[in-house]
Amino acid sequence: MVKELARIIEIPEGVAVEIGDDATVKVTGPLGTVSRRLWYPGIEIRKDESSLVVDAEITRKRHRSMVGTTAAHLNNMIKGVTDGFEYRMKAVYSHFPIQLKATKEELLISNFLGERKARSARIMGGSQVEVKGDTVIVTGIDKELVGQTMANIEQATKVRGFDVRVFQDGIYLVDKR
């Protein structure tokens, strides 16, 4: 019993996809350009008129899973350049009000648990961080960079050495779009 491995991804109007010789896929859309090398032995990515086809030469379990992974990466790249990704986070505190300030490279978190020294969270490559009161909005076109920026912010406010059931201060994810 041989299963059909090929995954077909439709390319929406206004999006251009280029596939290089070294399996580098470049997706350009209204919001910008995302480029990524999607190489795996035995996996082939080819472009038809208005779609991308991800196929494998071998029908083993590892290759089936890599076809799905590659197709998911391509879908995320297409969604990123058309709609973008947005994560909303909320600063939660009980006594000491957290003060947030975003620069181009980092988010400064002051007065966290009453600490005198400000904590900082690194903002990754193509992500933008906007602070509105206690809400932090992370946006961008690369899902992995936006997600890593969100994780950096959450990890910067992790409470260590105290009972996390009591000390629930921090900046937490509340919405993904």
Which stretches of residues belong to each language-model region?
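Ribosome-associated RNA-binding proteins
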Residues: M1-R177
